[in-house]
Amino acid sequence: MITGFQLIEEEICQRIQDELDKIGIHYRIFSRSKDEKSILEKIDRKAKEGSPYEKNGKLIQDIIGIRVVTYFRDDVNLVKTILSRIITFKDEEIDNPELTVFKPKRTNIICSFNDSQQQTFAEVQKSSDKDYYNVLDSTFELQLRTVLSEGWHEIDHSLRYKCKNDWEGHYENERLLNGIYASLETNDIALKNLFNELAYKHFKSKNWEGLLRNKFRLRFQLVPLKEQIVNILNEDVEIGKELFKMDRETSLLKLYDIDLSLPVNMNNLVLLLNGLIIKDEKLLAITPDVILEEIK
């Protein structure tokens, strides 16, 4: 373990967690920084593949790897949008799905270190006499995955990407492995649709907590909806309809943009979305001043 790289890794992870926790997205974060053995192995492997790393050419850009694994497919793009506002994206490798080909969809992004991380990286370089530091870039790789596809990507990376020769000429096996990914992708879509359907059923039965929980799919605190809010929603079903029809990603980004630290619970969600989008006077009348000041 190279201490300087580990410090940068921890700093990046904490920054990502701070941003995503603002709106309560369901996710897990994994990270690693390459040690000397891993760096030398990669340099040797790429040289044998005919694509060597060079001081003034191709550099190793993933000495630090960060993977954000979301519970739901639609959160991948949401996370990407949020992180693009706090991290400089240098290069992106994002696959577009093909209709007639079983192929995994990658969302891999090369990101630049910020100024303090650049300084730490430079200090690590200066303090070492190892030649391999000449082919290390001051970047990290950010990977975005869903929880269903995460295991498949781990298998693919360890048993196909790192040993490509094993798969040469075995196209049916390769197609089958990709087909397994395709089934996981289909299940990702089905999972999101399942919760949307459940949210609609809760809307029809005026189960407002069920609607909010399954529509927005956030890490809500276990705080029930206040009776005042429930009564207003029961009396005016159009408010519930607007909540159900609301574009989830757009509304969550609006919440993210607010410079206000509030607990992630259903009461705050309803009052914030009403103040930002719906504008119902009855809900505005019971909205705390601290929220009104921020959203006016």
Where do the PLM segments sit?
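Surface-exposed, low-hydrophobicity interaction/linker segments
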Residues: 6-50, 265
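Short cationic amphipathic helices and targeting signals
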Residues: 62-71, 142
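Short, flexible, solvent-exposed loop/turn segments with mixed acidic/basic and small polar residues
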Residues: 53-61, 131
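An acidic, glycine-/histidine-flanked metal-binding catalytic module
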Residues: 2-4, 8, 19, 132-296
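Short helix/loop capping segments that flank catalytic or ligand/cofactor-binding pockets
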Residues: 77-79, 118-120, 150-153
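A common structural junction motif
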Residues: 84-91, 163
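Short amphipathic alpha-helices in soluble, non-transmembrane regions
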Residues: 79-86, 123-127
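Short Gly/Thr-rich strand-loop-strand
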Residues: 90-132
